[in-house]
UniProtKB/Swiss-Prot annotation:
Protein encoded by which gene: lolB
Organism in which the protein naturally occurs: Haemophilus influenzae (strain PittEE)
Function: Plays a critical role in the incorporation of lipoproteins in the outer membrane after they are released by the LolA protein.
Lineage: Bacteria, Pseudomonadati, Pseudomonadota, Gammaproteobacteria, Pasteurellales
Assembly and binders: Monomer.
Pfam family for this entry, one: LolB
Stated name of the protein: Outer-membrane lipoprotein LolB
Length: 206
């Protein structure tokens, strides 16, 4: 257990130089109607993307934990996905794997722990309370059917508000890749738990 916490500390030392996103939500943002034809066409496109990969950089801040790392995300379905974190200052890696029987977290030193409850395992090992099952959709800019969301003037997802386990998450999609209209810089916040997740996606594969 201590080894995992030590690994998290290695990630933490690079937080100041990582993810140049502002921690504060943008203001005075203009939005357009959700019925916009270009947005609806894009929404249909990303809804068809069932499995995909994303690579980039991630920064996480909470009252008790903070770390920054490179990441590789591979998503197949809600019971099959992996998130690999790479330290920016060492060779340390952390692999989070979701499978049929639950979640397994392991590091490059051979330490490993599994549990049926993925949420509790993430909290115990990493100190992170982020709903990865929802992140799969948030990352590609696909709002849930019951989410309160806004469409930007670029005809892409601009922001959303979503309730998970009694707390409220907000997301702001700050920039998109020009070649495929997939998210580039995303700011996720949960004010009730004081968590901030800053994501920069450098590469999309789908």
């Amino acid at each position: 257990m201590k080894t995992f916490k030590f690994l998290t500390a290695l990630f933490a030392t690079a937080i100041l130089t990582a993810c140049t996103l502002d921690m504060e939500r943008p203001t005075n943002v203009q939005y357009i109607d959700k019925t916009d034809a270009i947005w609806q066409q894009h929404l249909q496109k990303i809804q068809k993307i069932q499995s995909y990969q994303a690579k980039g950089q991630i920064g996480y801040i909470s009252p008790t934990e903070r770390f920054s790392s490179r990441f590789e995300w591979q998503y197949q379905n809600p019971k099959s996905y992996t998130l690999k974190l790479y330290s920016l200052i060492s060779k340390s890696t952390l692999l989070i794997q979701m499978h049929q029987s639950g979640m397994t977290i392991s590091d490059n030193n051979g330490n490993q722990q599994s549990a049926a409850n993925a949420k509790l395992l993430l909290q115990e090992i990493i100190g992170m309370d982020v709903p990865l099952e929802h992140l799969a959709y948030w990352l590609k800019g696909q709002p849930a059917m019951n989410a309160d969301y806004q469409v930007g003037t670029n005809h892409l997802l601009g922001a959303f508000t979503y309730h998970v386990d009694g707390s409220q998450w907000t997301a702001d999609y700050l920039t998109y890749h020009s070649n495929n209209s997939m998210p580039e810089n995303i700011l996720l916040k949960n004010d009730s738990t004081k968590q901030t997740l800053k994501i920069r996606v450098d590469e999309w594969i789908y």
